[in-house]
Amino acid sequence: MTVFNIDTFDGHIILIDNGKKILLDTGCPYTIGIHDTFDFMGRQHHCFTSLAGFGINDISKLMNYQVDILMGMDLIGQYYLRIEYNSKTVTFSENEIPFQSICTTPIRSNMGAISVVLSVKNENVTLALDTGAKISYIGKKFTHNEVLNGKKTDFNPMIGNFETPIYNINASIEGVVFPVKFGNLPDM
């Protein structure tokens, strides 16, 4: 079990490992870096130098923050993971990590993507758990008639740059209520 310090930038989780800034991205299936391998947790791991035409420098420019590696699910999925925002740490382990929580919820994996079920406006909604996304996205039926709380620019490799309205909406897991900043993906 190894505990790493994390930083956050514009909603992104940045893991610091031996001076390298690593974007933790559960929404990306593959790891991307400048080189085709890198050392992590005492092992050498394969990574792509680009994905869908985007290299790590392109990703850094889109983020306005220089990262050395985007760690995707091909690598994250090899470990148990615990993210603790309050202590600004992330723990990786080859064995299950014991912890206490006010609630637990099943996390599902579908073709390498992680999803979680939230209750939003008394309806269960399955959403992607994407630590690489700075905005959580939900269907327009949930944001209809909500108060607009500004706009944000985001990027999706299949869509490009786009602007989305932002809404603060309460969600819950097992009765634990928390605010979420939701946006809407553009119509495709």
Question: What spans do the regions from the language model cover?
Answer:
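Pepsin/retropepsin-fold aspartyl endopeptidases
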Residues: 1-188
